[in-house]
Design a protein with these regions (language model features):
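Acidic, carboxylate-rich catalytic segments that either coordinate divalent cations
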Residues: 197-220
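Short loop-to-helix capping motifs
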Residues: 64-65
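Active-site-proximal alpha-helical scaffolds that flank and shape metal-associated catalytic sites
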Residues: 6, 68-173, 202, 206
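Basic/polar N-terminal segments that are highly enriched at the extreme N-terminus
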Residues: 1-5, 9, 220
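Long amphipathic all-alpha helical oligomerization modules
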Residues: 168-202
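Short alpha-helical hairpin
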Residues: 8-32, 51, 179-188
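Alpha-helical bundle segments that constitute or directly flank the non-heme di-iron/ferroxidase center
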Residues: 12-17, 31-61, 81, 130-140, ...
């Protein structure tokens, strides 16, 4: 079993609950109130700014050129790739960049990013990867599960772009690169170190679940 497979197996119960949250269900069937999605977009925009910092710290923590290049590449990819989905929706929702950047970060969001940043600053490259992977892989998991249950969800006039973006082949390929690096970094890890990575990944998976609930309730 690879390290990535172990992480996913350990968090299966948490992940199976993602698509049962009211927010994700609303995206899936197209019924989600646009105000809730607007709130989510702003909070996720703020989240991604710190998420990118975690990748940047990973660049500094990397012990070889391949890992350094990967972390640095993803920093660029998020800022100029994934953020494009957000910018497109922000335009449609009438959200100015200034509004997004000046909106207070919700407590659940702040707790999540603070945890990831602490792991990144205090620990090594594999631990950074464990903190990163839950978000990256779970969005693909959610989008593909939506399509399995609602095959036309990627054609929805409003939420289709969100679903298709995270269910795309290119997003999957990016995730495969991340998972492969995690597996290579941990080939010689002790059981104790591997379990620590499971603990980090599990914590971030729980934070992901809380984020969906936060978005539904529009918590402050």
């Amino acid at each position: 079993m690879t390290m990535t497979e172990r992480l996913l197996e350990a968090t299966k119960e948490i992940w199976d609950g993602y698509n049962e949250t009211p927010f994700v269900k609303g995206i899936a069937d197209g019924s989600l109130d646009h105000e809730k999605f607007k709130y989510y977009m702003i909070q996720d925009y703020r989240y991604l700014l710190d998420y990118t910092k975690v990748f940047s710290i990973g660049t500094a923590k990397a012990k070889n050129l391949d890992a350094m290049r990967l972390f640095a590449g993803y920093t660029h990819s998020i800022l100029d790739g994934e953020m494009d989905i957000h910018r497109a929706y922000m335009t449609r929702l009438g959200i100015a960049k200034e509004e997004a950047e000046q909106t207070p970060v919700a407590l659940d969001n702040l707790s999540y990013t603070s945890y990831m940043l602490r792991v990144a600053y205090e620990e090594g490259e594999a631990e950074v990867m464990a903190a990163i992977l839950s978000c990256a892989l779970s969005y693909e998991f959610i989008a593909k599960k939506i399509l399995a249950e609602y095959p036309a969800a990627d054609k929805h006039e409003f939420y289709g772009e969100w679903v298709s973006g995270y269910a795309s082949d290119s997003y999957h390929e990016d995730n495969e690169v991340l998972a492969d690096l995690m597996n290579r970094l941990t080939e010689d890890y002790s059981e104790k170190r591997k379990q620590h990575l499971v603990d980090i990944f599990t914590a971030c998976s729980r934070y992901e679940a809380a984020f969906w609930d936060m978005a539904w309730e529009m918590r402050q």
